[in-house]
């Protein structure tokens, strides 16, 4: 099956029929694929939000019951909240346990960003050299959403040639735009969690040491474990091996620049 942007797909299930048989909606893609003798890939973003639906468990069971019978449709389920996705797909008690292959997408490498961003600037008769693209990408830790946001801010500030000062000005401007959002989030952290975040920003390695616990008023070493878990569930931090990283590089930068200055 070769994609054809000029093709139109249509189906003949009426609204009244769907009201009588709502389950038909879940089989709609399969019915359409069979009728057109094609194969479809259905992509659903932020799928972890299914956990927030009313009677979520029953809904997930129904989804799986229908989808697992589809032979002409493949489902690609995306999400940005790793912890919530893992609960949906890797929890043995959940309906979507082992529903398919799990893939963790890595950050886009800087070398991949360089030609892409330079080309976009060239299309507008603007020039951004390799070093400036590298600076732009590394400032936001290769975070794809922020790379594109920062690139746009740099583009708007540039008449002809991008210089490092423009990138840094745009970077600080982006942090300023998000500062109110970050500020409001600080009210949701406990004092011990704030102390833990401050220790991370300060580069402390021995987070459970007596000196660190006292210096940052974190509490007990057992509290460190609970704080880590709570912050991971909130998608504030990520734990890869023994390394703790911030999920949001601009939140980390704001903490360093403004909150814990």
What are these regions (language model features)?
Residues 241-252:
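Accessory beta->alpha helical hairpin/"wing" motif in late/C-terminal subdomains of nucleic-acid enzymes
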Residues 138, 142, 148-219:
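Winged-helix-like regulatory helical subdomains adjacent to P-loop NTPase cores
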Residues 232-242:
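A short, conserved structural fragment
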Residues 250-261:
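Short, amphipathic alpha-helical interaction segments positioned at domain boundaries
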Residues 216-234:
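Short amphipathic alpha-helical interaction segments
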Residues 87-138, 160-161:
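Helix-loop-helix "sensor" segment of P-loop NTPases
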Residues 47-49, 80-84, 108-111, 154, ...:
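Conserved nucleotide-binding/hydrolysis micro-motifs of P-loop NTPases
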Residues 8-81, 90:
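Conserved Walker B catalytic segment
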């Amino acid at each position: 099956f070769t994609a054809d942007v000029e093709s139109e797909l249509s189906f003949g299930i009426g609204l009244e029929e769907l009201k009588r048989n709502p389950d038909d909606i879940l089989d709609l893609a399969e019915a359409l694929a069979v009728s057109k003798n094609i194969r479809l890939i259905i992509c659903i973003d932020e799928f972890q939000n299914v956990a927030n639906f009313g009677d979520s468990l029953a809904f997930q069971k129904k989804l799986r019951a229908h989808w697992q019978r589809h032979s002409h449709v493949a489902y690609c389920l995306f999400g940005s909240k790793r912890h919530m996705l893992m609960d949906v797909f890797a929890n043995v008690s959940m309906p979507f346990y082992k529903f398919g292959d799990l893939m963790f997408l890595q950050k886009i490498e800087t070398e991949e960003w360089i030609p892409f961003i330079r080309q976009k600037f060239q299309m507008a008769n603007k020039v951004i050299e390799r070093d400036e693209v590298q600076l732009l990408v590394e400032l936001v830790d290769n975070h794809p959403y922020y790379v594109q946001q920062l690139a746009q801010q740099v583009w708007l500030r540039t008449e002809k040639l991008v210089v490092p000062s423009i990138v840094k000005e745009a970077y600080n401007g982006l942090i300023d735009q998000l500062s109110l959002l970050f500020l409001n989030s600080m009210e949701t952290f406990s004092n011990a969690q704030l102390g833990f975040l401050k220790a991370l920003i300060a580069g402390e390695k021995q987070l459970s040491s007596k000196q660190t616990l006292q210096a940052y008023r974190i509490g007990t070493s057992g509290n460190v474990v609970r704080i880590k878990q709570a912050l991971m569930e909130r998608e504030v931090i990520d734990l890869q091996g023994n390394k703790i990283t911030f999920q949001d590089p601009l939140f980390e930068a704001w903490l360093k620049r403004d909150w814990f200055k």
